[in-house]
Amino acid sequence: MSERYSGPLVVEGKLADAERMKQESNYLRGTITDDLNDGLTGGFNGDNFLLIRFHGMYQQDDRDIRAERAEQKLEPRHAMMLRCRLPGGVMTPQQWLAIDKFAGEKTLYGSIRITNRQTFQFHGILKGDLKSAHQLLHEVGLDALATANDVNRNVLCTSNPVESELHQQAYEWAKKISEHLLPRTRAYAEVWLDKEKVATTDEEPILGPTYLPRKFKTTVVIPPQNDVDLHANDLNFVAISDNGQLVGFNVLVGGGLSIAHGDKTTYPRTASELGYIPLAQTLAVAEAVVTTQRDWGNRTNRKNAKTKYTLERVGVDTFKQEVERRAGMTFETVRPYAFTGRGDRIGWVKGIDNKWHLTLFIENGRLLDYPGRPLKTGMAEIAKIHKGDFRLTANQNLIVAGVATRDKAKIEALARQYGLIDDSVTEQRQNSMACVSLPTCPLAMAEAERFLPEFVTQVEGIMHKHGVGDDHIVLRVTGCPNGCGRAMLAEIGLVGKAIGRYNLHIGGNREGTRIPRMYRENITEKEILTEIDQLVARWAGERHSGEGFGDFAIRVGIVKPVLDPAIDFYD
């Protein structure tokens, strides 16, 4: 074992308080039911504030009115964000109509938010409506179990509408992996679905009684598209096909983007290759990776608890050998694969099954009825007549999938009528993304979703001025260093530092395989735009044919590439 990877397999010391909370929760039940019946507050108290995350919810409040309510001696306007479990992002039009109705009638904001983890969120559910939200999901075959906190979260799958058979096979594995790694506790059914308590002892054979040390994210990726951003995830299965049929996976572990401002023991990390496996070993390997991280992950310091830090402590080879031992297999040599991009193909594409698929660009993933653009109503109208399925993408867009040729014109007419198709949207806007951030996210340090549209307009102006208006730069904005906007895999990434201020990172690539380096710290929007103007001017004038902005920034030495982030991210 090298000096670098000489850390202990298990970190000893005083456990983080979250470990106590999980241990005492009675398999995630806590006293959530008591809090649901407490009409004196709109929120959850004590441990329950964190426990509800295992049930797919975050307690939030409207930060725009927090100070005003404090002046009035009122508690914050508590409301919950609820995130659905939707492996691969696939859902039926009937499910869509059910969530559309709930969002319109029972949430403070009246919107459906598609996320870059290929699912949807309701924002602004009052405590008294939470049970009906979970019961509605259950009635249409969905749930919110394990979409947050220290479990395997929603499993992503490349939204590949063209290779229909390969996508179906990969999607089936995403569902199987999700189901296999789910918590076994009956707490969710008892609390939200009013299922009777069964006189049996709960067991968690995979996750264990205190679940995982930290959140855990999994993807199934179909090259050459890296739309799911595999390097942001703990466990990745890269699909290897032969004659259009899925035959196995390359397995990569230990990606992750979240950092903490000012804490140089935290850093983003791209995932490491373990090797190739045939399909039959998929669930055993998934389980072995999860249980190894369960047992070896750092439970004393949550900022150092993710799989990426476990790998840096013990070394990839040691981790790999343990996975092989637990799964009773040996990894084969990685099969060749390559990525060419991450963006969605907006508009119509035809699959090899002769069905048509319409990818709709949904800015920020926010479906709401805007003045003159009733997007949410438009999607409901499409759902009423669509005979295929809907696929939410990891770029926060929506695919109307499986459209027969005879139905194409009708679907497109509805999409245009309601503003869901806008031919003036640029490539730049299509390749820009932000997390939710203010006003609902309690962790937000700066604006992101509300900031992005006008900021992109400014960037479009710069691109046009320098003659590259038809090209794009992968642009991401995240409201805090937890990194939900995946700015740490962008060509230009903004990371919120304070209201109106961001760290500017540049030098990622279009394929999403390189982490960008911080170029300027704690600067304003005006300063950011000045920097981008100067950088785009150089890119436009000096780039090689077809050279992306991030690759250019590295080649000409504007920033040094991040090669080994545990060592050189802060250089």
UniProtKB/Swiss-Prot annotation:
Keywords: 4Fe-4S, Amino-acid biosynthesis, Cysteine biosynthesis, Heme, Iron, Iron-sulfur, Metal-binding, NADP, Oxidoreductase. Its EC number is 1.8.1.2. The keyword Signal does not apply. Its cofactor is siroheme; [4Fe-4S] cluster. It comes from the Bacteria. Belongs to the nitrite and sulfite reductase 4Fe-4S domain family. It is an enzyme of class 1 (oxidoreductase). It catalyses: hydrogen sulfide + 3 NADP(+) + 3 H2O = sulfite + 3 NADPH + 4 H(+). Binds 1 siroheme per subunit. Alpha(8)-beta(8). The alpha component is a flavoprotein, the beta component is a hemoprotein. This is Sulfite reductase [NADPH] hemoprotein beta-component. NCBIfam families: CysI, PRK13504.1. Siroheme binds at residue 484.
